[in-house]
Amino acid sequence: MNITHIMAQTMYTQDMYMLINTCFDGTEHKFCTGHAKRKDSLAPIGLNQAKGNAEVINPKHFIRYIKNLDACDAIILHGLFNFKHFIFISRKKEWLEKTCWVIWGGDIYRYNEKSNRWGVKLTEYLKQKYACQIGYVATLVDKDLPLARQWYHVGGKHFSLSYPLPIQRPGVMQKLTDKGNKKGFGKKTVKVMLGNSATLTNCHMDALQELAAFAPEDMKLYIPLTYGFKGYEEYREMVVQEAVRIFGEHKVVPVTESMDGEAYSEFISDMDIGIFYNDRQQAMGNIAIALASGVKIYIRNDTTMWGNYEGRGFRIENAFTLSEETFDTFRYYDPVKKENNMALIRKYTDINLIRDKWKQLFTEM
């Protein structure tokens, strides 16, 4: 079996690459991924042959890239956010038929976004026209599947997948667990993480209004704003200005410097509360790290994520009720809930479970 993975450079690319090389025969897999756009990108990972047997192909080597698409037995499209790869895959029906589109969330929720950018419009056009011919589809949240079928007429065989995270690296989960077990809410400054990126779907402005009543309280707001879609810098500045207006500069910490996976996990593990006011499935890697670290989590109950966590037994708080809480109820995390959530996230992020899901996909494609 010769499988080609098309995956952008993200904070999680290294962990996927290592999963393939440690749990599968790396010689049967190739990764098509370019260099990070910026030196301070969320992908200072430099995938190369030294890290495993899976070959890494730069799409800029065009002839080699196209020959590989033609020769491989299966194509795994890790997210479909832009036209750059799909414009080639869609040229041949046989390429589409051997492709699995792994839906990340943002790639289907673009359907509801209005954009004048020609790249976004072209990507949506290609998805509308050719996604129905893709042979396989995978989701990270099963409730995203009906939306993909409704919006893009996806009809391929469905698989449920999970991605490896930095918390599966040696020793990381134990560090997070130890931190989580020690957490309590005594008289200390409450560290609150808001969102995961500088994207509109984080709904930062709405979340800040929900939190405004706590402005006089002893809390500090950490806002990850390292990346986003094109032009995100302007949105990032708006979020920071509004947060500072409400809470004051001394209580707001914009996170604009990128980190590798382990450093970012360490950052999240220092938080007491995580608020993800996202209006769609997003930030699940961040949420998993936070849950493992004993962080109290708030998400909206109108997203597919809510049903996903609730159905698995997690005790997550509804972000829509934030404005109804007192600061004491906000900062308090029931120890029973915390223990339950930490145990469940260890179960659902078990590397063997993740491996078996990918094994099923590779076997049945």
Predicted feature descriptions by range:
Residues 11, 326-365:
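A charged, aromatic-enriched C-terminal amphipathic alpha-helix characteristic of glycosyltransferases
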Residues 11-18, 199-213:
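A conserved mid-protein helix/loop that constitutes part of the nucleotide-sugar donor-binding site
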Residues 109-129:
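Nucleotide-sugar donor phosphate/pyrophosphate-binding loop at the beta->alpha transition
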Residues 126-172, 176, 357:
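A short, active-site helix/loop in glycosyltransferases that binds the activated sugar's phosphate group
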Residues 173-202, 221-223, 346-347:
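Conserved donor-binding/catalytic core segment of Leloir-type glycosyltransferases
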Residues 236-258:
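Nucleotide-activated donor-binding/catalytic signature segment of Leloir-type glycosyltransferases, i.e.
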